[in-house]
């Protein structure tokens, strides 16, 4: 499907059909989309915690704001997106090893340059105290890929930002794994009585958001 058309048609599901489940083949495609998401300096700071069962939904529900409970309760699948609490040298070497394995790096000299270059950018964030902020931005990139990837497969989704991150971390014992939850996405097929399905999409006109820099006042 043309991406503009996909962007026009995609909407946020407000209610899912609890009886419709995402085929496992499509779940694997969604996981691949997340795996392939772009990130600054290929940092890949994320961890994706995938839930499908009623038990997994009950486990995260206490951290979700009550007005979003319905989206957790009725969805087919959901993903808690977490980011690492810092990207230490060990993890950076894990990234480098994978890049070598995948054929992105031809020799040791290039490998050294790649490691030092990425470490430079990561250390910049560390020194400024912006690591979590920066990693969260990467998580949003992955989430966006998931939302549109799901839409391309005919799967509806709801991004959830309003939840108690610290409570979610405790519920899932994320501190033990050195990661912090930042986003939740619910996935499934919208219910027939989902009012958002038929509402017209509303966005500001392009004239209000795009400006020609050659004519933009300095």
Question: What does each of the following model-derived ranges do?
Answer:
Residues 1-218:
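Acidic, surface-exposed loops and disordered segments
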């Amino acid at each position: 499907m043309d991406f503009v058309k996909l962007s026009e048609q995609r909407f946020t599901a407000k209610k899912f059909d609890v009886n419709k489940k995402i085929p496992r083949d499509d779940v694997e495609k969604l996981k691949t989309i997340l795996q392939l998401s772009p990130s600054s300096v290929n940092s890949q700071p994320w961890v994706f915690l995938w839930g499908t069962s009623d038990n997994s939904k009950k486990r995260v529900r206490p951290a979700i704001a009550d007005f979003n409970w319905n989206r957790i309760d009725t969805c087919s699948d959901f993903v808690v997106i977490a980011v690492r609490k810092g990207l230490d040298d060990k993890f950076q070497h894990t990234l480098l090893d994978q890049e070598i394995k995948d054929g992105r790096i031809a020799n040791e000299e290039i490998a050294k340059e790649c490691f030092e270059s990425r470490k430079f950018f990561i250390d910049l964030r560390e020194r400024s105290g912006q690591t979590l902020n920066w990693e969260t931005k990467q998580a949003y990139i992955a989430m966006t890929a998931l939302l549109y990837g799901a839409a391309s497969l005919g799967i509806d989704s709801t991004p959830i930002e309003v939840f108690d991150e610290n409570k979610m971390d405790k519920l899932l014992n994320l501190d033990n794994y050195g990661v912090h939850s930042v986003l939740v996405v619910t996935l499934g097929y919208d219910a027939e009585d989902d009012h958002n399905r038929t509402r017209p999409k509303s966005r500001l006109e392009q004239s209000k958001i795009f400006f020609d820099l050659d004519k933009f006042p300095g």
